[in-house]
Amino acid sequence: MSNKVHVKKGDTVVLLTGEGKEAGKKGKVLEVNTKDGTVIVEGMNIVKKHQKPRSQYQQGGIINKEAPIHASNVMLVCPKCGKPTKVRRRILENGEKIRECKKCNGTIDVIREAKK
């Protein structure tokens, strides 16, 4: 079962909820997992991972790593108006499928090209 996620890899998002100073921060989406509806955002939800050395070249120790955040806790930032917005998906007359900003009605990107 795949969940629809309103953000894609490379989008800029703002965190809606979080502990302490995390809420309201902006970051870039590094990875989207549609299976469980989570996203990994650059520089947010940092956790410390204790890692054992696996080979003579890999060092062990405590490393900082981004943990997944549920997609409902992030909101897309429109590249046109720069505000956090909801996403509208629309199919144009020529068959092209696009994502639109609900605040400024600007096109965010093309999901599927028009069929020829």
Curated annotation (Swiss-Prot):
Pfam families: ribosomal_L24 (PF17136). Gene3D superfamilies: 2.30.30.30. It comes from the Bacteria. One of its GO terms (molecular function) is rRNA binding. One of its GO terms (cellular component) is ribonucleoprotein complex. Keywords: Ribonucleoprotein, Ribosomal protein, RNA-binding, rRNA-binding. GO terms for biological process: translation. Signal peptide: none annotated. One of two assembly initiator proteins, it binds directly to the 5'-end of the 23S rRNA, where it nucleates assembly of the 50S subunit. Belongs to the universal ribosomal protein uL24 family. Part of the 50S ribosomal subunit. This is Large ribosomal subunit protein uL24.
